[in-house]
Structure formats: C-alpha cells, structure tokens
A protein has these predicted regions:
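Hydrophobic, well-ordered secondary-structure elements that form the walls
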Residues: 1, 65, 88, 109, ...
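Append "and occasionally in soluble cytosolic enzymes with long acidic Gly/Pro-rich linkers
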Residues: 2-86, 90-91, 155-160, 176, ...
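Conserved catalytic core of Hanks-type protein kinase domains
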Residues: 4, 140, 187
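Bilobed periplasmic-binding protein-like "clamshell/Venus-flytrap" ligand-binding domains
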Residues: 12-15, 53-72, 116-126, 171-208
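Conserved beta-strand edge residues that scaffold enzyme active sites
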Residues: 27-28, 102-103, 202
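Short, solvent-exposed loop/beta-turn-alpha elements that line the ligand-binding surface or hinge
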Residues: 30-45, 55-61, 110-117, 138-166, ...
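Flexible loop/turn segments at secondary-structure boundaries
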Residues: 32, 71-75, 104-106, 129-133, ...
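Periplasmic binding protein-like
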Residues: 89-146, 180
Length: 229
C-alpha cells in the first residue's frame, strides 16, 4: 500500500503544505537507519505484489479504516483520506471509511483493534507526534504496549522488535542509543506496519505584531521568546 500513494500529487492538493515521508523520521536523522524498503510511488510494483497475493481489479482486497472528519493534527482529513482511497483503488485495495468524531477516534486508538469500538476496522488513521523514541516508535511496535497499555492499536510486535527496543533502552551513551534507534526505525520501515502519508508542516497565520516566533519541526511551540509589538 505504501507504493500506491502519489504523495507529490497529495502535496499539490494541499498547496504544498506537507512534507513527503520516507519513514517516521527523515533521511539524515540520527534514527534513520537506512532501511532497505524505499517508500515511493510505484503502482506497477504494488500491483505485482497484490497480484501475487491473489488480488486484482475484479477481486480487490477490501478493508475498513476508521478516520475522523476533523480534529487536532489531522490536517485536512476528509480530502486527504479520499485521495488515498482513490490511490489505493488503483492497486486493487477497496477502502471503506468509518468516519467518527475526533475525540472518539483518539479514544478508539488506545483501546485497540480487538475492541468493539473498532467496528470491524482493519486500520485506523490518527496523526501522531514523533518527538521522542517512545512516541515515534516504541508505543507502536512493542508487545508491552498492546492496548490498553498504549497505542499499539493493531497489536504489532514480536521478539525481534522487543529486542531492538530493549537494546535502545539499555544503551546510555548518545551515539550508541542513536545507532540502536536507527536499527529499530529501519526495521519498522521494512516491515511497514503503517502507510506513511504525510509529514505535517504546521502552517499558521501570524499577525505582523508578533516577533521572535520560531517555527519548530513539531506541533509544540516555544512561546517563551515570542513578543508582541
């Protein structure tokens, strides 16, 4: 599915207000890790994989995805999700949406795919912050973060990932820990438990009276240096 989404086209739809992901962190980041799988737009390769799995245009794979109509950090969820839905259809994946309110979606994310609130969904689309190793990777890949402990909605994890996480947690020098986290990130991208759609760039409108604002690569803004004329 990661091969089916034309992210350049999506960026055009959003007026340039997104960055194209190659994983949870970008190439050049200390946690990048140089994964073997390249997240890209390659419909022919995706169709080949789907055909090998027994699917076709006349026999598509059907899946339900829980999404929200609005909400914190969701960018433009309805047009974006509909764009992805159309993209996946070219790769023999027929997506049905279960559209729910943002706070309900966020709660469902915590209780997991096996809960009745999932309403039979096979996936959930929730934006997330990647500000530290736990938020970025661990909570989605550890067998110790299965619901309701944390946000491993799809119960993804195994002994290999638990070992990679333990290696990072038990390494206390910065370079060694970054190397361990890079190995974890590389394996996450290679196993692809997510479809990486977009990095939010946090567009905002500011009054000319506001000074010393620094745009972070995050949703979280440091207001301490900001002044107003």
């Amino acid at each position: 599915a990661n091969l089916c989404v034309d992210r350049e086209g999506l960026r055009t739809l959003l007026g340039g207000m997104m960055a194209i992901p190659k994983g949870t962190v970008p190439p050049g980041h200390p946690w990048w890790g140089d994964p073997k799988f390249d997240i890209r737009y390659d419909v022919a390769a995706a169709q080949k994989l789907m055909t090998e799995a027994g699917f076709s245009a006349s026999k598509p794979m059907k899946a339900k995805v829980q999404i929200s109509a609005s909400g914190s950090g969701q960018m433009q969820p309805l047009p974006m999700n509909e764009y992805v839905q159309q993209s996946l259809k070219k790769c023999y994946i027929d997506i049905e949406f279960d559209v729910i309110e943002w706070n309900t979606l966020f709660t469902n994310w915590r209780v997991g795919a096996k809960d009745q609130t999932a309403n039979g969904a096979h996936a959930i689309n929730v934006s997330f912050a990647a500000m530290d190793p736990f938020f970025a990777m661990v909570r989605f890949t550890s067998t110790k973060t299965f619901p309701p402990v944390s946000n491993n909605w799809g119960y993804f994890g195994n002994a290999e990932f638990d070992k990679l996480i333990a290696d990072a947690r038990q390494t206390f020098d910065d370079k060694g820990r970054d190397a361990a986290l890079a190995r974890l990130h590389a394996r996450i991208v290679e196993e692809a438990p997510f479809i990486w759609i977009a990095h939010d760039v946090g567009p905002r409108a500011l009054s000319k009276r506001i000074k010393n604002f620094v745009q972070p690569r995050s949703w979280f803004v440091d207001i301490a240096p900001i002044t107003m004329d």
